[in-house]
A protein has these predicted regions:
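Residue(s) in the substrate-gating loop at a strand-loop-helix junction
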Residues: 3
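Short, flexible catalytic-loop segment of classical short-chain dehydrogenase/reductase
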Residues: 46-56, 60
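Conserved SDR Rossmann-fold cofactor-binding beta-strand/turn motif
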Residues: 40-50, 96, 109-111
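Alpha-helical segment proximal to the catalytic Tyr-Lys
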Residues: 32-36, 101
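A conserved structural motif in NAD(P)-dependent oxidoreductases
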Residues: 64-65, 77-88
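A short C-terminal helix-loop "cap" of Rossmann-like NAD(P)-dependent dehydrogenase/epimerase domains
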Residues: 59-76
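Active-site helix of classical SDR
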Residues: 19
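Short C-terminal tail/terminal secondary-structure segment
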Residues: 8, 93, 104-120
Length: 120
């Protein structure tokens, strides 16, 4: 699992960005090295996804303002909301299926338009 931060710069995320960039490099290397063995490798780069981590972060860092901050974070996405874990899972399931048998060495942004539509 990669992240959109490997596509766009985000303040104060040096180590996280570097590790997600490494996931991309690993994805491409595995795809190239094992293509003749029938092994496919792709990466998925989500943007903000509404998980319990987000709720916990907001409650710890913005007590009493969780709803306001959640709304603010959601509005940074061009679609106006965070992704849902099931949406990420559906993409991963597709990439693992035979229906995606012609896809390898690719990264898939699943970000509500964040990378391409935010002017980054």
């Amino acid at each position: 699992m990669a992240s959109i931060v490997s596509h766009v710069a985000v303040n104060n995320r040096f180590a996280y960005t570097m590790t997600k960039g490494a996931v991309h490099a690993m994805t491409f290397a595995i795809a190239k090295d094992h293509i003749h063995e029938g092994i496919r490798c792709n990466s998925v780069s989500p943007a903000r996804v509404h998980t319990p981590f987000v709720d916990d972060y907001l409650s710890k860092n913005y007590p009493g303002k969780e709803k306001e901050m959640f709304k603010n974070l959601s509005q940074t996405q061009p679609l106006g909301r965070m992704g849902q874990p099931e949406e990420i899972a559906n993409l991963v399931l597709y990439l693992c299926s035979d229906e995606a048998s012609f896809i390898t060495g690719s990264d898939f942004s699943i970000d509500g338009g964040f990378v391409k539509l935010n002017g980054n």
